[in-house]
Amino acid sequence: MPIPKAFALLGPTACGKTALALKIAETLPVEIISLDSALVYTGMDIGTAKPSASERAFVPHHLIDIITPVQTYSAARFVEDCTRLIGEITARGKCPLIVGGTMMYFRALTQGLNDLPEADACLRADLDEQKQMYGLDFLYRTLQKVDPETACRLKPNDSQRIERALEVYYLTGKPMSEHLGRQSPHTLPFDLHTAALIPENRARLHENIALRFHLMLEQGFIGEVENLRRRYPGLTADSPAIRCVGYRQAWEYLDGKTDFPAFVEKGIAATRQLAKRQLTWLRKTPLDCVADPFSDGTSCTRLIEAAKRFFGA
């Protein structure tokens, strides 16, 4: 029995991935698997540029609105869910189309997961207490002592990754850098064709990001974040959901830590930094075909034709 096929459409934020995916859906019987760590959360629609109800009615979407903002999702769970969905979609006679820009998830899918321990709620609570008492800098200095290699590649204000690295060390007695260095070879259980939208005109991408951020504000983004604060009292600025680009900046604004113009500036800047990181990942990712979304249009047409050839349409 032939193994399933899946077509991945990658790209930075605000480059037109959703629009191109819908064009592919006009020519192939696809079902879309979201490769976006922000779209998993319910109630976070505007700030994540979540596909509209009409778009989701036009073509089935998966891994959207599957948890609440106080719950957590991981690369390991994505790999499990995505692999299962590829099999289920193929069994229905449809074409799995993976669309998004969360490159950490894509790397886990294609290169495998490291044998790291699951999160430990008690240990994480202890680390949070240490952070509250002594500051994040204390945790970072601790990490520098027990795992200098990981500390060197992390920013001193990256609370989530610093705590995770310490958690791994305390649970296993070995630094995360050692675990990452022992990753075993990985074989995909499906045939994957990887395409990407990579804009040559970065100024155009930056303009798109700013325009989309202002559109989100017009659509009620601040009200959306206010609603999250009311509905989920347990949410904080350090919650994974609120660390999503735009939400952290809105949270700080609503906390009175910044004024509105500064919030907008920071939100746009953070989104541009996200796009830069995504493009850096893409440069290191083996790609079967690439298109410039801001070219004359023939480039994206080639991706559509590539998808058709791959699925034998």
Curated annotation (Swiss-Prot):
SUPFAM superfamilies: P-loop containing nucleoside triphosphate hydrolases. InterPro entries: Dimethylallyltransferase (IPR039657), IPT (IPR018022), P-loop_NTPase (IPR027417). Gene3D superfamilies: 1.10.20.140, P-loop containing nucleotide triphosphate hydrolases (3.40.50.300). Keywords: ATP-binding, Magnesium, Nucleotide-binding, Transferase, tRNA processing. The record marks T102, R124 as: Interaction with substrate tRNA. Disulfide bonds: none annotated. The keyword rRNA processing does not apply. ATP binds at G11, P12, T13, A14, C15, G16, K17, T18. Its EC number is 2.5.1.75. It comes from the Bacteria. GO terms for molecular function: ATP binding; tRNA dimethylallyltransferase activity. GO terms for biological process: tRNA modification. It is an enzyme of class 2 (transferase). Pfam families: IPPT. Its cofactor is Mg(2+). It catalyses: adenosine(37) in tRNA + dimethylallyl diphosphate = N(6)-dimethylallyladenosine(37) in tRNA + diphosphate. Substrate binds at T13, A14, C15, G16, K17, T18. NCBIfam families: miaA. HAMAP family: IPP_trans (MF_00185). Belongs to the IPP transferase family. Monomer. PANTHER family: TRNA DIMETHYLALLYLTRANSFERASE. This is tRNA dimethylallyltransferase.
